[in-house]
């Protein structure tokens, strides 16, 4: 049994219908009737000595579970068991996207775009380096102010001139030097009250 080749995923979407003995156009009532009939025939309690009946019963249950779920049945009808595997891996809502992106024309489009943009270097330059290091960057709208670079030296000079203009009276007294013991040796007694409680 270990030497047995693993079953490949089909894309036709017909084998589950064959398990139940139906064709692809079967209604949900036909699926239920066929399932009940085959489940009674191959149930493990009715065939305790037959391990093949237990395997057949598992296949019947699997086919019934997939074909009675409308979403899974639709995926199976379109893409076969490969579609069910993709739905398991990526989610049922992403199956169509997966098959579109894995089609030959989507791969060809990706390769052509890669070749036209020098392995996507142009895209990287436009997104990361602001369109050729800023040479081709888009113009700002008429009403908005454009951003410009200010050197740190110019900014420092501007801040110092603003400080000089803002102070009306110069500071004449130097602050007293302080150490860790300043509060301990001070002549006045410290007050632990806040301003509101004096």
UniProtKB/Swiss-Prot annotation:
PTM comment text: Formation of the chaperone complex DNAJC5/HSC70 is not regulated by phosphorylation. Ser-10 phosphorylation induces an order-to-disorder transition triggering the interaction with Lys-58. This conformational switch modulates DNAJC5's cellular functions by reducing binding to syntaxin and synaptogamin without altering HSC70 interactions. Palmitoylated. Could be palmitoylated by DHHC3, DHHC7, DHHC15 and DHHC17. Palmitoylation occurs probably in the cysteine-rich domain and regulates DNAJC5 membrane attachment.
Effect on the protein upon substituting residue 135 to H: No effect on palmitoylation. No change in subcellular location
Tagged with keyword Protein biosynthesis: no
Residues with N6-acetyllysine modification: 56
GO MF term list: ATP-dependent protein binding
Effect of residue 121 to F: No effect on palmitoylation. No change in subcellular location
One example of a Gene Ontology biological process annotation: neuron apoptotic process
Membrane-topology annotation of the record: Lipid-anchor
GO cellular component, one term: plasma membrane
Gene3D superfamilies: DnaJ domain
Effect in UniProt of substituting residue 118 to G: No effect on palmitoylation. No change in subcellular location
Main function: Acts as a co-chaperone for the SNARE protein SNAP-25. Involved in the calcium-mediated control of a late stage of exocytosis. Acts as a general chaperone in regulated exocytosis. May have an important role in presynaptic function. May be involved in calcium-dependent neurotransmitter release at nerve endings.
Subunit structure: Homodimer. Interacts with the chaperone complex consisting of HSC70 and SGTA. Interacts with ZDHHC13 (via ANK repeats). Interacts with ZDHHC17 (via ANK repeats). Interacts with SYT1, SYT5 and SYT7, and with SYT9, forming a complex with SNAP25. The interaction with SYT9 is stimulated tenfold in presence of calcium.
Protein name: DnaJ homolog subfamily C member 5
Organism per entry: Mus musculus
């Amino acid at each position: 049994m270990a030497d047995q080749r693993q079953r490949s995923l089909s894309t036709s979407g017909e084998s589950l219908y064959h398990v139940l003995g139906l064709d692809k156009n079967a209604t949900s009532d036909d699926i239920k009737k066929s399932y009940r009939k085959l489940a009674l025939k191959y149930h493990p309690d009715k065939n305790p000595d037959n391990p093949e009946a237990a395997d057949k019963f598992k296949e019947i249950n699997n086919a019934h579970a997939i074909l009675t779920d409308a979403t899974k049945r639709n995926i199976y009808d379109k893409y076969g068991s490969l579609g069910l595997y993709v739905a398991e891996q990526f989610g049922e809502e992403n199956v169509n996207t997966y098959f579109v992106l894995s089609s030959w024309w989507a791969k060809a489009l990706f390769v052509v775009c890669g070749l036209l943009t020098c392995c996507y270097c142009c895209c990287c330059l436009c997104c990361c380096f602001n369109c050729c290091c800023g040479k081709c960057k888009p113009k700002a709208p008429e009403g908005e102010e454009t951003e410009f670079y200010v050197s740190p030296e110019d900014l420092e000079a501007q801040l110092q001139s603003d400080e000089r203009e803002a102070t009306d009276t110069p500071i004449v007294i130097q602050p007293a030097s302080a150490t860790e013991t300043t509060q301990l040796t001070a002549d006045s007694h410290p007050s632990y009250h806040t301003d509101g409680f004096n």
